[in-house]
């Protein structure tokens, strides 16, 4: 071989040598790198972060098998304690070179970057590559500007035969309800459309008004009202009739499970049926929003025991757990919850149920689409947590209008609830619509009657958020306003107060700058 050929051969040999050398160096460096981060880049508030450590160093992997790696999650340099008192994570081997632990996102965690940190391994400092993860929020469909007032009707009484005494004293058909909505200063009418079980054997829904609701929607639009309809998700209105194919929630009495009238929140067929019921309304151009009530484990919930123990980080079960029967495991959870001595355990139970509800909402929203706002009713004791609801998770999952049911509490309880809400949530966290009920009995027959109703509503508007007034309210419900327990003030007295509240919330909305979640 001579001349150019020999030179080319020499060049290729040198190139191959350097390629092999550099490639070997890169492989060696890659094998040395230890990566620590989340299993994805971003999370929402109902998520459980999988903190992962990955290495191609087999010697280090073997070392971790003898002494598992430990980690924490930090924000702004501060180590965080999350749900169930979880602070330090001990990672377990998920695959060769892969170690992981689960970290539930804290209640209403601030938006921003979070950094996992490896503990006790200063020797790996130069090799460690840490990837932060983001906790964010979903942006909901905005509320109408200038304040928003909703009048509800929680009734499946036949609209076709309904007679209503209108505000002017004349007797009308169901259209009289819309007269009242307008008279109260409402911008929207929301009606219960889906209640279970049906009137016939095996029927899922009471079908009495289903066919007439599109006509009601058109009439609302003709009057300048928005229209919405909702379905009850978990609770059914019969103590004896069970819908075929459903799993129902379980309560524990005398150490034995008792079937309730609430469908289990994990029942997939219920999600199918609710989505199928609401979808035609979500697609109807005359329907402005759709919603759900009882979107929680309304009764019982102990059928979820095994799921909770398996899925929720930080839950410590007794050593004999695998040997216990299902009834015994449910009884253990019931006693643990009722005793309320373990605050971390209660925190875990509440968070995990709220997560399960949020996952149901997320799937419901996916099936209904993003074109229309999704409304949900939320109970207000302990910010909803007591009932397995969290408005921040709900917002992230797909609820656009979260209606807070400030019902039934006496004055000290009402003050305590509002104090909790004020400390917990800000206007950018979720779109809250506080509401109150036309019912003197549920105001403890306060001598002020409707004036107490109004006082509570104004307080909720002013104080539910920690940084400004609410921009919407709802009145529950027109059936109670017309035919309910109203004391000596009657319909007119309560309606006058509601009208005043409508003006109040709109004036507050106009004077306060809008803050987007």
Predicted features along the sequence, with ranges:
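Mature N-terminal, pre-catalytic/accessory segment of carbohydrate-active enzymes
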Residues: 11-191, 203-204, 208-211, 506-517
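Active-site-adjacent "subsite" loops/lids of carbohydrate-active enzymes
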Residues: 143, 149-171, 211-217, 226-285, ...
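The substrate-binding groove and active-site-proximal loops of carbohydrate-active enzymes
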Residues: 153-168, 197-210, 257-272, 345-357, ...
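Catalytic domains of carbohydrate-active enzymes, especially glycoside hydrolases
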Residues: 169-197, 284-288, 394-402, 464-472
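Alpha-helical scaffolding within the catalytic cores
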Residues: 172-177, 211-213, 362, 379-395, ...
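Aromatic-lined substrate-binding rim segments of carbohydrate-active enzymes
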Residues: 176-178, 182, 190-238, 348-368
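Polysaccharide-binding and catalytic clefts of secreted carbohydrate-active enzymes
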Residues: 180, 256-401, 405-408
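Substrate-binding cleft of secreted/luminal carbohydrate-active enzymes
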Residues: 399-416, 420-516
């Amino acid at each position: 071989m001579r001349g150019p050929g020999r030179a080319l051969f020499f060049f290729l040999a040198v190139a191959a040598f350097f390629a092999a050398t550099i490639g070997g160096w890169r492989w060696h460096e890659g094998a040395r790198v230890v990566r620590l981060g989340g299993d994805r880049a971003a999370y929402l508030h109902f998520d459980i972060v999988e903190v992962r450590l990955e290495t191609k160093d087999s010697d280090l992997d073997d070392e971790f098998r003898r002494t598992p790696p430990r980690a924490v999650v930090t924000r702004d340099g501060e180590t965080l304690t999350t749900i169930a008192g979880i602070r330090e994570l001990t990672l377990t081997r998920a695959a060769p070179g892969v170690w992981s632990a689960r970290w539930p996102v804290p209640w209403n965690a601030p938006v921003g970057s979070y950094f996992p940190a490896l503990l006790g391994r200063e020797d790996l400092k130069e090799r460690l590559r840490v990837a932060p993860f983001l906790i964010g929020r979903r942006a909901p469909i905005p509320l109408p500007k200038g304040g928003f007032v909703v009048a509800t009707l929680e009734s499946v009484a036949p609209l076709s035969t309904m007679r209503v005494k209108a505000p002017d004293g004349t007797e009308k058909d169901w259209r009289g309800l819309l007269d009242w909505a307008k008279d109260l200063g409402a911008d929207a009418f929301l009606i219960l459309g889906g209640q279970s079980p049906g009137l016939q054997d095996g029927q899922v829904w009471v079908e009495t008004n289903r066919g007439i609701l599109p006509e009601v929607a058109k009439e609302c639009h003709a009057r300048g009202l928005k229209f919405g309809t909702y379905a009850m998700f978990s609770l059914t209105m019969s103590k004896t009739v069970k819908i075929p194919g459903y799993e129902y929630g379980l309560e524990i009495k005398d150490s034995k499970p008792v079937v309730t009238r609430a469908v289990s929140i994990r029942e997939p067929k219920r999600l199918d049926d609710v989505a199928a019921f609401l979808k035609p309304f979500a697609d109807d151009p005359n329907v402005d929003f759709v919603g759900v009530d009882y979107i929680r484990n309304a009764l019982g919930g102990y059928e979820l025991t095994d799921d909770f123990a398996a899925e929720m980080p930080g839950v410590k079960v007794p050593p004999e757990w695998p040997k216990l029967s299902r009834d015994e495991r449910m009884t253990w959870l019931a006693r643990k919850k009722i005793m309320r001595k373990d605050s971390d355990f209660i925190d875990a139970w509440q968070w995990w149920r709220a997560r399960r509800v949020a996952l149901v909402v997320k799937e419901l929203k996916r099936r209904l689409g993003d074109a229309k706002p999704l409304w949900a009713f939320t109970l207000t004791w302990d910010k909803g947590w007591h009932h397995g609801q969290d408005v921040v998770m709900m917002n992230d999952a797909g609820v656009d209008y979260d209606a807070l049911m400030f019902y039934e509490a006496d004055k000290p309880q009402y003050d305590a609830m509002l104090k909790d809400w004020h400390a917990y949530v800000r206007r950018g966290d979720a779109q809250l619509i506080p509401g109150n009920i036309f019912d003197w009995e549920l105001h403890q027959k306060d001598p002020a009657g409707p004036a107490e109703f109004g006082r509570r509503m104004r307080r909720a508007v002013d104080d539910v958020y920690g940084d400004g007034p609410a921009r919407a309210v709802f009145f529950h419900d027109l059936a109670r306003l017309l035919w309910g327990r109203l004391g000596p003030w009657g319909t007119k007295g309560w309606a006058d107060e509601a009208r005043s509240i409508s003006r109040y919330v709109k004036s507050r909305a106009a004077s306060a700058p809008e803050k987007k979640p």
